[in-house]
């Protein structure tokens, strides 16, 4: 068998994300129509395993095996993340802003219409709710890459666009070698995640009754052993993007239907 070094390759095609790819083993992930997370592992182009994590019970992983059976002699089984480590999950908010709502500022726009220009803007405020930390101690894990991905996803209930690059960084940072899709050297580590949830309120400066709530999240993930520790990941709308053209476009598209417009300034 050929040993392959872990890769940090992370790409997306349509709604399926490639989480891990070492040239022989490929792990992909996506969210199905019911909100479940689904992870698949391919070996030399052939599907060998599919794991499903229910949005209602993320600590249980349903596994299906293709072309062979697992070490338990079954084509299907379930595992619990607590079989592989110790989970300490806090649902208490560590911190909220001193004021119940933070004013980020106002984005001022100008659109071209038949009669000339129209000026308008968005007043943008947000709440920040910090939850955690959640910690998961992995005890001597040996097994497939897709199971490791699923275990971490289930432990932290973080979205696939976040768990993908983190697991790739963890595998690379720990210097793990994968042989035919299997991590054979026992992996032990403690991973910690602090989640910050943002709820934005966008209010039309020309009509206060025209408003909308949108969300985003920040995940600070670290561990005790990896060279890739202390990573921050963002999803959705976060203050990290405030002042960027991208955020001005995102928020405008959430609220307005003008096709020819520009940002005048931020205030």
Segments (PLM) and residue ranges:
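Low-complexity, repetitive regions of proteins mediating host interaction that are extracellular
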Residues: 23, 131, 141, 148-152, ...
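Transmembrane alpha-helical hairpins and terminal membrane-anchor modules
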Residues: 165-190
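A structural detector for beta-sheet-dominated domains
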Residues: 20, 30, 40-44, 54, ...
């Amino acid at each position: 068998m050929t040993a392959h070094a872990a890769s940090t390759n992370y790409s997306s095609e349509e709604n399926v994300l490639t989480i891990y790819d070492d040239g022989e083993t490929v792990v992909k992930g996506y969210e199905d129509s019911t909100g479940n997370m689904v992870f698949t592992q391919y070996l030399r182009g052939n599907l060998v395993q599919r794991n499903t994590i229910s949005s209602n019970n993320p600590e249980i992983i349903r596994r299906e095996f293709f072309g062979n059976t697992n070490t338990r002699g079954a084509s299907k089984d379930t595992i619990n993340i607590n079989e592989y480590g110790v989970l300490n999950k806090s649902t208490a908010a560590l911190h909220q802003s001193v004021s119940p709502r933070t004013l980020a500022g106002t984005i001022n726009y100008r659109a071209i219409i038949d009669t000339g220009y129209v000026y308008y803007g968005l007043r943008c405020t947000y709440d920040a709710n910090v939850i955690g930390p959640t910690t998961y101690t992995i005890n001597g894990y040996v097994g497939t890459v897709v199971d490791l991905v699923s275990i971490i996803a289930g432990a932290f209930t973080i979205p696939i666009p976040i768990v993908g690059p983190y697991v790739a960084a963890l595998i690379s940072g720990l210097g793990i070698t994968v042989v035919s899709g299997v991590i054979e050297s026992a992996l032990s580590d403690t991973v910690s995640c602090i989640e910050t949830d943002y709820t934005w309120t966008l209010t039309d400066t020309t009509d206060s009754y025209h408003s909308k709530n949108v969300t985003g999240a920040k995940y600070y993930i670290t561990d005790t052993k990896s060279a890739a520790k202390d990573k921050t990941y963002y999803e959705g709308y976060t203050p990290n993007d405030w002042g960027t053209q991208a955020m001005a476009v995102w928020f405008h598209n959430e609220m307005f239907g003008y096709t020819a417009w520009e940002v005048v300034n931020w205030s």
